[in-house]
């Protein structure tokens, strides 16, 4: 534990094209090996493709997808007297956003389309319609928390 206390949160810079901090976070999550311009090209291409397919605002589609993927509950392991219990806990807002972005990008990479731009675009559109692997991951997480509700009194 650092003696100075927690490091201060740095403000997120809004991206230049859409002016949205959420798009900046998505770009940073897609980023591999420090190639920011490549990550920007992928994300902006995916958002433009989403605009062409859905005909609406791509940032609104991304926000809707995020709302459909963000978990509100998760399970954490807690060891009590030699037994390990999966204890359901609420997810803080910052963590839920981070998890949703991680799942969106992770399941985009696992898709079968040819380019990462297409994969990300289709995963965002699927998630905004309540479909896709990222939404299924959220449902599985909530189901796990629901089935372990009996251990909620071990919460810390």
UniProtKB/Swiss-Prot annotation:
GO biological process, alphabetically ordered: translation
GO terms assigned for molecular function: rRNA binding; structural constituent of ribosome; tRNA binding
Top-level taxonomic group: Bacteria
SUPFAM superfamilies xrefs: Ribosomal protein S7
Keywords from the UniProt entry: Ribonucleoprotein, Ribosomal protein, RNA-binding, rRNA-binding, tRNA-binding
Family affiliation: Belongs to the universal ribosomal protein uS7 family.
Subunit structure: Part of the 30S ribosomal subunit. Contacts proteins S9 and S11.
Protein name (record): Small ribosomal subunit protein uS7
Provenance organism: Pseudarthrobacter chlorophenolicus (strain ATCC 700700 / DSM 12829 / CIP 107037 / JCM 12360 / KCTC 9906 / NCIMB 13794 / A6)
Gene: rpsG
């Amino acid at each position: 534990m650092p003696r100075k206390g927690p490091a201060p949160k740095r403000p997120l810079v809004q991206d230049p094209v859409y002016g949205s901090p959420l798009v900046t976070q998505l770009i940073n999550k897609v980023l591999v090996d420090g190639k920011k311009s490549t990550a920007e090209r992928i994300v902006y291409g995916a958002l433009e493709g989403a605009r062409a397919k859905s005909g609406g605002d791509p940032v609104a589609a991304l926000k809707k997808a995020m709302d459909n993927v963000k978990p509100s509950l998760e399970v954490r392991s807690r060891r009590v007297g030699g037994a390990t219990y999966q204890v359901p806990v609420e997810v803080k807002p910052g963590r839920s956003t981070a998890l949703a972005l991680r799942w969106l990008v992770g399941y985009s990479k696992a898709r079968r389309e040819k380019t990462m731009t297409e994969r990300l675009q289709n995963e965002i559109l699927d998630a905004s319609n309540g479909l896709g692997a990222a939404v299924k991951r959220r449902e599985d997480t909530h189901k796990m928390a629901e089935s372990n509700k009996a251990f909620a009194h071990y919460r810390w």
